[in-house]
A protein has these predicted regions:
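Residue(s) in the substrate-gating loop at a strand-loop-helix junction
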Residues: 29
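Alpha-helical segment proximal to the catalytic Tyr-Lys
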Residues: 14, 59-63, 128
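Active-site helix of classical SDR
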Residues: 9, 46, 54
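Short, flexible catalytic-loop segment of classical short-chain dehydrogenase/reductase
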Residues: 33, 73-83, 87
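Active-site loop-to-helix junction immediately N-terminal to the catalytic Tyr of the SDR YXXXK motif
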Residues: 36-44, 56, 84
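A conserved structural motif in NAD(P)-dependent oxidoreductases
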Residues: 91-92, 104-115
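Short C-terminal tail/terminal secondary-structure segment
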Residues: 131-153
């Protein structure tokens, strides 16, 4: 998760420096600096490192008109998620997907196209004043408190 992104950034920065502008979008995860799961310490560590890398590179290259941002994805309905669902429940693979979706405030997983549209926006001139940003795309999964004295909705 870290070495490949680092190498990709270094390779991408060279032509961007030459042309005088550019945008890099790093794919991170909500796992790491926002949430953590038992047994995923190494994954969480690497994804948190990507957030730090985003911020460090953003500061370093902002004056060169190069923007670096990161996305922090929750669950998306990708072929990988569908494969994991099939492996966990070969009889009814839709069940684990719905179990995850039911815990998301928006009651669904992200569509791959929604994630792609966020990447396209961050790479476009429409986001020209964003750098060093962490954009969470998780349907609100990281918003609720696990314990609350508030009212139920």
């Amino acid at each position: 998760n870290i070495k490949g992104v680092w190498n990709s950034c270094q390779a991408s920065l060279k032509p961007m420096l030459k042309q005088g502008y550019g945008s890099i979008v790093i794919a991170s995860s909500v796992t790491g600096d926002l949430v953590a799961d038992a047994g995923e310490a190494a994954y969480a560590m690497t994804k948190s490192a990507l957030v730090g890398l985003t911020k460090a590179l953003a500061v370093e290259y902002a004056h060169k008109n190069i923007r670096i941002n990161c996305t922090q994805l929750g669950y998306a309905r990708t072929p990988m998620v569908e494969k994991m669902a099939l492996e966990s429940n070969p009889i009814n693979p839709e069940e684990p997907i719905q179990d995850i979706a039911s815990a998301v405030p928006m009651k669904r997983l992200a569509k791959p196209t929604e994630v792609g549209e966020l990447f396209a926006f961050l790479g476009s001139d429409e986001s020209s004043y964003l750098t060093g940003s962490q954009i969470v795309i998780d349907g609100g999964s990281t918003l609720p408190e696990t314990l609350s004295m508030g009212t139920d909705h």
